[in-house]
Amino acid sequence: MRQTARFVLRKTLLISFFLLFTGFLSAQAFPDRFIGHWKGKLNIYQGPKLAQTISVALEVFPADSGRYDWVITYGDSGKDIRRYMLIPVDTAKGHWAIDEKDGIVLDIFVTGKKFTSTFAVMGSAVQVCYWIEGEELLMEIWSFNEKPDHKSGLGTEEVPEVNVYKFSGYHFARMQKAVK
């Protein structure tokens, strides 16, 4: 019985160490795996239908002091360019910030394999998520009304009140590394 308990304890410690170590490696892989010039297509959905597809590019390159240039280009003309800066805040906890260089700074977090920011602007709440699958960089943007569309539930301890939000849009991009 004591040997079984020791075995279980060792196995638990080994699994815990493995999970901690893989989390550490995942944190170390970011943003290094994102470095480069990525190009692809951004699908913009309105309701269930694909409304528009445009070109999108993301450039991520080391700048200084642990910061990175984070440059997003929308469309083929190359006129809609967003020159942002990725800034480390508390990288051990996966906390970064995107400085839009106009007074807007958005928190963004590494959670698992995804890099996610949630914010509200002009009445819309927006969630942006980046991650890498295989050799592709994927991006999702979800948007919904900032104010609840309606409420549900009873407002009791057993059945709390729940705010329900009207969904307004979804964008999805699939990008591959490219030579600029």
Which residues make up each language-model segment?
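Beta-sheet ligand-binding and adhesion/scaffold domains
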Residues: H95-K180
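N-terminal helix-cap/turn-to-beta initiation motif at the start of protein domains
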Residues: L25-K39, A51, P62-A63, I87-P88, ...
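A short hydrophobic beta-strand element
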Residues: G36-G40, Y68, L137-I141
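Short, solvent-exposed loop/hinge segments that bridge or flank secondary-structure elements
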Residues: A29, K39-D69, L154-T156, V162-K180
